[in-house]
Amino acid sequence: MTSPESADVPFLLRPAQPADLPVLERFAAASAYGITTLPPDSAVLAERLQRSASAFATEDAASGEEIYLFVVEDVASGAVVGTSGIAASAGFADRFYCYRNEYVVHASPPLGASNRTHTLHLCHDLTGVTLLTSFYVEPAYERTLAPQLLSRGRLLFIAQFAERFSDRIGAESPGLADDSGRCPFWDAVGRRYFDMDYPSVERLAVGRSRSFIADLMPPSPIYVPLLPEEAQWSIGQLHPVGELPFSILVDEGMDPDTYVDIFDGGPTAHARVAQLKTVAASREIVVAGIAESASHRARGWQLAASARRADFRAVLLPGHARGRSLELGAQAARLLGVQVGDTLRLAPAPVATQATAGDRHD
């Protein structure tokens, strides 16, 4: 049995509730263009919070239309400092469109000439995959452990309740766009067929099937060398706000190079759920005891999540559990809502940054 961890549990991941609407409104107002799952629309956010609460609470079999929204709290202050989400099935009501990167070879043997050309193909390969969505963390918390818990903690939820999700997973990251909403990729490709600017088409896409894209976009491949140089360069590039969550997903083992977003050209990463680092390393463990205080400060961090869906909780604990049981500190047990004999799901937290529990730097 592993001895109790330090009492310093910095953050708590929990399901978002309707009462969290004001803070989500603030996050949505501060988020970048391209994050359509966190729109600056109070009515849409309220509806998503209600759908999420229903998804966590229902005893019905999964239908695929569920969304799950999480928030992370600073334990010391009780403040909500970030959010993330899961969509059980991309394109639940219709197809989920993106561009697939391919290379076409044209050759003339008599001339001894050949060309390998980058092309983009409109596809719906990722229809039905589980999507990671809605990531946002307060700038002051970007260098703390909060982003790690926000991103990787929801993977423990997927691992624990695998029957409610696809065996494939994807994540869209925002592409390049400036503060005014100008997007080089959209201006070069989509605007030629939609006659609207990038912010307008993003607003149009909120809560709507993307089938209208197939109705208006040509099905033939886009030859990338024919695009303006700025648009070519932007394909697969990230908006700066996407770099932190993107780096965590790539560290998890997601492939960021095959697909790009149909609107802004940002990378759409994908993977098999079972191959994700956190999922593959996760295991169930029994709470063997609860101690009032910890004996020492352990090195490293591990993710720990409760095994209940309706009141799911996840935290980062110092140290690495060994064996099949764990003695928790009283603070961690209280935050997770567990007692002796309850089951937790644990996974190592491969924190690749210099983040610590106490840093609060911009």
Predicted regions and their residues:
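Conserved acyl-donor/pantetheine-binding loop and adjacent beta-alpha core of acyl/acetyltransferases
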Residues: 88-134, 199-207
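A generic structural signal for residues embedded in beta-strands
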Residues: 344-346
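A short beta-loop-alpha structural element at the N-terminal edge
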Residues: 12-24, 37
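Short, Lys/Arg- and Gly-enriched loop/turn segments at beta-strand edges
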Residues: 351-361
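Extended, composition-driven regions rather than compact fold-specific motifs
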Residues: 65-71, 80-81, 86, 91-95, ...
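Active-site rim helix/loop that mediates acceptor-substrate recognition in acyltransferases
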Residues: 37-81, 85-98
